[in-house]
Amino acid sequence: MKLTCMMIVAVLFLTAWTVVTAEPHSSNVLENLYLKAHHEMENPEASKLNTRDRCQRANFVCDAFHHAAVCCEGVCVLVCA
């Protein structure tokens, strides 16, 4: 019985904590994301999604620090293939 009461109190406390610490104006967060995306559509250079300029050519030597993310095509197995 005591364990059940403690569990109920813990759940109520965590629920209250979530409500108290919640973002008060969460709609503004979505609005800001929309405005940022709209700006990136008007100015493609501002977009962080255009990462093709950081791609490495084929036969680029890649190691533990330069992994498959830097190869434009294929995979990294000691060199970009």
From Swiss-Prot:
Residues making up the propeptide: 23-53
InterPro entries per the UniProt record, alphabetical: Conotoxin
Keywords on record: Disulfide bond, Knottin, Neurotoxin, Secreted, Signal, Toxin
Protein name: Conotoxin A11GB
Tissue expression pattern: Expressed by the venom duct.
Cleaved signal peptide residues: 1-22
Cysteine disulfide partners in this protein: 55-72, 62-76, 71-80
Origin species: Conus vexillum (Flag cone)
Top-level taxonomic group: Eukaryota
